[in-house]
């Protein structure tokens, strides 16, 4: 009934609407969710032997971690925690690059676990507390 391009356009509008109405705290949650989703897809593509799709999914996860989560850290206000997170994100990126080169599902799973732990901790933080000092 609907074309694939129509459905894709609707999904894009839905995502854009969610981003536009999200709080800064929710935007970070969305980045965690997006990175996790890309990692799950990468692992599934690896299991299916779809090397191209695996590479694209890992690239998306790396992009979200590097240009979203890491870039969003406030080194000045975050102090040691921000520095530690930045180093952990760098480690995750290296592991995902290795996973892509070596078709290493364990490396993907390792990053999934690390990211899941950080995301869970983020969800425990009050949205007010996470951005209160930014004002």
Curated annotation (Swiss-Prot):
Record-linked NCBIfam families: fliS
Similarity field: Belongs to the FliS family.
Gene3D superfamilies per the UniProt record, alphabetical: Flagellar protein FliS
Pfam families hit by this protein: FliS
Entry superkingdom: Bacteria
Alphabetical list of CDD domains matching this protein: FliS
Signal peptide limits: none
Protein name per Swiss-Prot or TrEMBL: Flagellar secretion chaperone FliS
Species of origin: Salmonella typhimurium (strain LT2 / SGSC1412 / ATCC 700720)
One BP annotation, GO: bacterial-type flagellum assembly
GO cellular component: cytosol
Cellular compartment(s): Cytoplasm, Cytosol
Keywords: Bacterial flagellum biogenesis, Chaperone, Cytoplasm
């Amino acid at each position: 009934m609907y074309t694939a391009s129509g459905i894709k356009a609707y999904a894009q509008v839905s995502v854009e609407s969610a981003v536009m109405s999200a709080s800064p705290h929710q935007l970070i949650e969305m980045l965690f969710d997006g990175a996790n989703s890309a990692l799950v897809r990468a692992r599934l593509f690896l299991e299916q032997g779809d090397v191209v799709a695996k590479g694209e999914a890992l690239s998306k996860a790396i992009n979200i971690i590097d240009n979203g989560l890491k870039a969003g850290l406030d080194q000045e206000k975050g102090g040691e925690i921000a520095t530690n997170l930045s180093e952990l994100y760098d480690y995750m990126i290296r592991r995902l690059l290795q996973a892509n080169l070596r078709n290493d599902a364990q490396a993907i799973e390792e990053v999934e676990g690390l990211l899941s732990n950080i995301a869970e901790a983020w969800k425990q933080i009050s949205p007010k507390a996470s951005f209160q000092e930014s004002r």
